[in-house]
Amino acid sequence: MLIYVVYSEGFESNAKSLRTAVKNEWSDASVNLMGAYGKTDSFAKYQIQINKDIIYSSESVTDNTTIINLIKERL
């Protein structure tokens, strides 16, 4: 399983925490973190994908448990 976490500058620690949570749940998962930077300081993005399917996308972060549950729903 390949998970992409696309995040803006302020969400890096959240993205790293999610990577750890996903690896704890599925040790064989690959998690790619991709920083995204906008043209303004107010740019915010937190997006989670399984392969090419977006399962969460927002200008704010949600908790890891919610994301893990969204992944489980797609499996």
What are these model-derived regions, one by one?
Residues 1, 23, 27-29, 33, ...:
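A domain-level signal for the structural core that forms small-molecule/cofactor-binding pockets
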Residues 1-25:
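Local sequence-structure signature of Cys/Sec-based thiol-disulfide redox active-site neighborhoods
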Residues 7, 27-41:
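Thiol-based oxidoreductase modules, predominantly thioredoxin-like and allied folds used
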Residues 22, 50-52:
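Residue-level signal for short segments within beta-strands and strand-turn junctions
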Residues 31, 48-50, 71:
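Hydrophobic aliphatic residue packing
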Residues 40-50:
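Structural micro-motif
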Residues 53-75:
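Non-catalytic, surface beta->alpha helical segment in thiol-disulfide oxidoreductase systems
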